[in-house]
Amino acid sequence: MLSFATKEHGLANKNFYKVPNGPDSYVSSCIGINAVERKVKGLPARAPEAFPPPIEPIAFLVEQAANSRLPGHYHQADQFQVFVSGEGSFGIKPITGMTVHYAMAFTPYAPIHATTAPIEYYTLRNGWDPGAQWMPEKKSGLMARVHPYRHGLGLVPALVGEKDGPTNIQGLLEQNVIPFEPDGLGATLYQSTSAVTIKGPSPATGRGQYWLILKGQCSINEHAGSQRSMAFVSPDEPAPTVIAGAEGVSVLMLQFPKR
């Protein structure tokens, strides 16, 4: 069954969290209950799942404080991060606009630096993760190297209505953000300036998809969505029916690789 959440739903589940060895932050739960929310609400900890974990969408927005640094770490689930606001750097690479980062399980990444303004990013997972494994303290957990390191960054093209963004699109514009790989990993930006039907790849070609509305409005199956609404589609479901609003939409589709 498709999971759907609006921006308002996430902000209604917003919690302050002080990273033990890092910055102050706010975490807004959009889909599922993540490890931070469990800690804040005093819920019992969940044990790690065997890899790959069962399909379970968990999505949240992180607001990382200005002039802060989130240390390097890794997770035990595959994930995407979509940077939507603020400027900073990811490792040595600058973040100056909307950016997509993917990191497969057991792949160290970061640090994430926020500059003079807070930085906001969505973390999107398709399975349970018990929390960050900080480096270098948890380096021993990587010694077996059962899972190859795999991560990368993709810049989101200018959106409709932005400077240098597309105008008067005839039909639908599809732009690669993360080029698709044979196992299904990839991300595509779909843009329109009118009401069109958007057809993405079959979810069966990967291990689940997130659809994140970056601008405008569209419906995803029976759900009406606007900016920063999102949906998760399991790999055993049909491709969602996505219909842009009368003035168009910019919507990002992110697909996890098969395991």
Label the predicted regions.
Residues 1-54, 134-188:
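A short, N-terminal "cap"/entry segment at the start of jelly-roll beta-barrel domains
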Residues 46-89, 93, 98:
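The feature marks the first
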Residues 52, 67-80, 113-117, 196-211, ...:
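Short, low-complexity cationic-aromatic patches
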Residues 53-66, 181-197:
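Short, flexible domain-boundary/linker segments around small modular repeats
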Residues 65, 75-93, 200-221, 227:
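Glycine- and acidic-residue-biased ligand/ion/polar-headgroup-sensing regions
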Residues 94-95, 105-134, 224-226, 235-259:
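Ligand-binding loop in jelly-roll beta-barrel domains
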Residues 99, 228-229:
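Structural motif
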